[in-house]
Amino acid sequence: MKITYDPRHNVAYLRLEEKSAEVETIRISEELNVDLTPDGKIYGIELLNATQQLHAVQDGKLVLENEATGKTVEVSLP
């Protein structure tokens, strides 16, 4: 899994698959797209207007939490 952010276009992308694949993009809303592989698996999730969506969550920080251990890691967003 990899999360990328493009500040030029204010887009964040959560890529769930490591290998490149042909995808079909499903528009969920004006600010959310989901990419599906031909076999129906979720390849990635694209957040448009990302800073607005992600800043509303945790004061401008991306928080990753391991629910099994309770450990968290915070990453400041640009």
Predicted regions and their residues:
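Small, basic N-terminal interaction modules of short regulatory proteins
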Residues: 1-78
